[in-house]
Amino acid sequence: MEDCCDPLLATDASPRPESFSRSEKDIASRSRTVAMADLDSNCELSNDVDMEQSSPDLMKLEQSSDPVALDGKVVLGFSLASPDLVNCGASPDLPRGSYEDSPEFSKKRRFSTELSLENGIDGSTTTTRLGRKSQVVKFSAICQTFGYELSPESSFELPSPPGDFRESMTPVISINSGSISTDVTVEDVTFLKDEFFSGGESITTDAVVGNEDEILLYQTARLGNFAYKFQSLDPGDYFIDLHFAEIEFTKGPPGVISGLDLFSQVGANTPLVIEDLRMLVGREGELSIRLEGVTGAAILCGISIRKETTATYVEETGMLAVKGSTDTVLSQQTQENLVCRAEEEAEGMRSDCEQQRKEMEDMKRMVEELKLENQQKTRECEEALNSLSEIQNELMRKSMHVGSLAFAVEGQVKEKSRWFSSLRDLTRKLKIMKVEQIKLLEEATTYKHLVQDINEFSSHIQSRVKQDAELHENLKVKFVAGEKERKELYNKILELKGNIRVFCRCRPLNFEETEAGVSMGIDVESTKNGEVIVMSNGFPKKSFKFDSVFGPNASQADVFEDTAPFATSVIDGYNVCIFAYGQTGTGKTFTMEGTQHDRGVNYRTLENLFRIIKAREHRYNYEISVSVLEVYNEQIRDLLVPASQSASAPKRFEIRQLSEGNHHVPGLVEAPVKSIEEVWDVLKTGSNARAVGKTTANEHSSRSHCIHCVMVKGENLLNGECTKSKLWLVDLAGSERVAKTEVQGERLKETQNINKSLSALGDVIFALANKSSHIPFRNSKLTHLLQDSLGGDSKTLMFVQISPNENDQSETLCSLNFASRVRGIELGPAKKQLDNTELLKYKQMVEKWKQDMKGKDEQIRKMEETMYGLEAKIKERDTKNKTLQDKVKELESQLLVERKLARQHVDTKIAEQQTKQQTEDENNTSKRPPLTNILLGSASKEMVNLTRPSLLESTTSYDLAPLPSGVPKYNDLSEKENNPEMADQVHLPNKTGRFSICAKRIPSAPAPRRSSLAPTTSTSREMVYLTRPPLSESTTSYDLPPLPNGGLKYSDLIEKVNNQEMAEQVQIPKRIGAGRSSICAKRIPPAPRRKSFAPMPFIPITSTLTSPDEKSGANQVLCTSPKLHRSNGKTLTSILRRSIQKRMQMKPSPRQQPMRRGGGINVGMERVRLSIGNRGRLAHRVLLTNARKAGLKETPQKQERWI
């Protein structure tokens, strides 16, 4: 059956078809079509309803409107009172179409009973068609049942039964539809729980429906398309009561159900009972009731079945007799007449239908022709309309042209009138101007008098302007100072918070993790307090504290709010580095770059940078350039180089250190920018060229470390200060585990390099946290680039990105531990990066001077080498001098031995000479002039040895002999040592500097300079000892033997000096003069100690050389030299001093340092006293330098030697 949109409730109560055979006179059903009229379309005719053949008697009965008697029996009447039996197809609420019964109805040709309920529910109205023995009860539109058109008055109506009709019925079974619990009794009828059904569903309600006895019956119902089937029933007539109540909306629009609409009839929650539906059950004993919802759903609360006790079958006559208050007998003959008549009417209707079909085809053909003609006329109308529009356009253009010409003419006329009026105005203005000129001349004279006042006022204004200018300068200076203080305080605040600030951000769970039901590994509530708590199995595991913590719900604006102050630091001249760290897939690139509609830290920081520059444009001048690079597989790549150029000839970039100490990558493309749009285009170009790949952990994984460098050069227009700072925006690649990501090939190499660089970064952070002396910045290109940022001269911000997935808990803990170490680093205050261009020039000049100094140092080095050669020569000379000194000491020791031998021979001679000298002195006393009172030298400095005992027992004082004529005067003093010509001249001796306790000074005669150390026979070098008493009266002189090669050793000399007994036997002479030794051929033994402080007389001493005169002892010459007297008086003092010096040399000093490497004498910075020439004359003091390198150690104790 086709879908029917007519909202009808169909109820089918049909018994099972019987198996008995039919007679030859059974009614044959034929199908006919019902034409449905519509305003827009025609419904084709179809065979829709089976029409039974009726007998002539039934045809007659059909023409009557009331039930009449036929052959003495009462038959069914026909009523034309129901207009709803006609289907109006033009309803706008219902779709149009054709309707026909189900195929089962046509095939089985069962008998059916149609009941129309359009006239109300007061009386049962049925339409009966006889045929087979199965009956059908349906509530449907008549157009669905009958195959021919019926007039509005045509319907079937059953007469009302008499009052005692229900009393003759016997209840069979009653069902409470939808009830599953207990039975319900209503008006002595017991309704059983719901049974014998198929389909539908049970519904219940708590609403009160009906009276108190019917509440339980109508509170349950069966809804939908369902059927009830009752078996094992006795053949006969049955009456069915159907109980309805719409306790639930049945999805059917109210008021449009044709047939049975409960809501429109009685409303909701109100019972509706359809009673006395008659049904004939055959011998099979089956009865079925089917309810279908045509529109919406069918609903039924209860079924009650009763049996009529008076209905019987008259099988003998072949008649069906229904006995009750009215008997109805339908004969087979009447039925045959009805069938014949129905066939005739069907044939007529077929011919009419065929004729109408032909007419319809003619009408269609005519309609097609009219359509073609209409199209042709339409085209002609369109062409005419187009031509008309063109003509109208042309007419409009012409009219506009004419209007423009008229407007131009009118304008020219108005222009001419304007010129005339303006001429009249000019004439009038000329007269007025003449009058005004006169007035202006008068005013000019007045203004001349006002000029002086204006000049005075202008001078006052200028002075005020000058004061304001000074005030402006003061304010300018204060403003600069305040601005500087603001910067310092602002940066101090950031420094107090820490040079490396650490922000933590947790991404939200993605769609896949949410679908999989992954648990949260981070406590979201803790992020509001700046703390991150890692959860494990729902319990806190470890907590971390950072400067700022952003949860999964934090926006990009919230993240940038704490990052904004770093843009101000960049403008103020400080280096700033912002980088993101974390495992792959945690949102590092999203935080740094973001999307087009949700920008990240990079874009917002640069936007804030240009906003500050805009606000300071009247006080500062800034230049900004941008470069983008990446570290891919430990290689630096410039992302701003075109792809074609980078692919053809890839350039290797290296990191260089500038003279200021900063690190730079030469050769990078630096793009100058003027606005945030240009900056973003450059950064976008670099980001597009970045190496990105797909892994199992992240679909868009960064395979390199991306670094954006923004260089800012600023100049203060007020004080001329220049700054040069850098902003580093670093997006690190995510750390990955090879076992987790399952990468291979090139991806494996990338992962290894990424992990290597991040491991190097971890080593640097560990070394900085432990304040190690060596920081391994050069282990990776990444750490080498970040050396300036992590080294302490910049302000650094780190974003640590973590995942809330509990499966990533190990990576999250690693990232948080790393961030905690970074937060604990103390780098010290950041330094302001000044642009010292002039300083660089000076440094270049210094470098040039350094090069020149290197050349001079080379020359100095050559000179030092020369000096080293000279030092070597000096050492060699010193070695020779030392050798000579050793020889001199050996000779002196030999002299001591010779003196011992010679002293025994001269004692007698000395005694004789002393006796003679005393005699001569007594004789010559009266002849000598008195000595002068003026001493030649200071008496306090000229000492005569008073420890020597007197030779004579008498205390007689002796007068000193007068000076010989050959003695020079005191004022003839000159430099005999430096002038060779004066070497042979005689002059007074210099002051000896020795203390003398003698009463009178004994002058000494000068001796001529010696040019050799060889022994001389001159009497001027002879030594006479006057303090020793004579051993004998002999005056014989002895010649000293020459010194043998194996003379007295130096050790023997020391032994003699230290031995007092040997000192008395052998007298050691003192060096003559200031440290000079006199080497004579002959020596006179010293005199014995004096026992008196009386002055010694002059004793003439003869030569000690072996001569005939000496041997005879005659003609001895007296020695009157002052030099001889002085040497005799100081012999003992010299001996004692020399003995003390020898002992000091024998005892090593505890503080004496070892000799310098290389040996030799000490030739350091020492003062050396040189004595050249006569005894007692001090030479010039010369400062000698050793010219040794400063690296050599000097002896702590300086030594002095007298040569």
From Swiss-Prot:
Pfam families, per database record: Kinesin, Malectin
Domain of life from the UniProt record: Eukaryota
Ranges where the record places region Disordered: 1-28, 907-931
Claim: Coiled coil is one of the keywords in the record: yes
Residues in coiled coil: 336-395, 846-901
Start-end of Basic and acidic residues biased regions: 19-28
Matching Gene3D superfamilies: Galactose-binding lectin, Kinesin motor domain
Keywords carried by this UniProt record: ATP-binding, Coiled coil, Microtubule, Motor protein, Nucleotide-binding
InterPro entries, alphabetized: Kinesin-like_fam, Kinesin_motor_CS, Kinesin_motor_dom, Kinesin_motor_dom_sf, Malectin_dom, P-loop_NTPase
GO process terms (BP): microtubule-based movement
All copies of domain Kinesin motor, residue ranges: 499-825
Any single GO CC term annotated in Swiss-Prot or TrEMBL for this entry: microtubule
Binding site for ATP: G582, Q583, T584, G585, T586, G587, K588, T589
GO molecular function: ATP binding; microtubule binding; microtubule motor activity
Similarity field: Belongs to the TRAFAC class myosin-kinesin ATPase superfamily. Kinesin family. KIN-14 subfamily.
Annotated protein name in UniProt: Kinesin-like protein KIN-14Q
Organism: Arabidopsis thaliana (Mouse-ear cress)
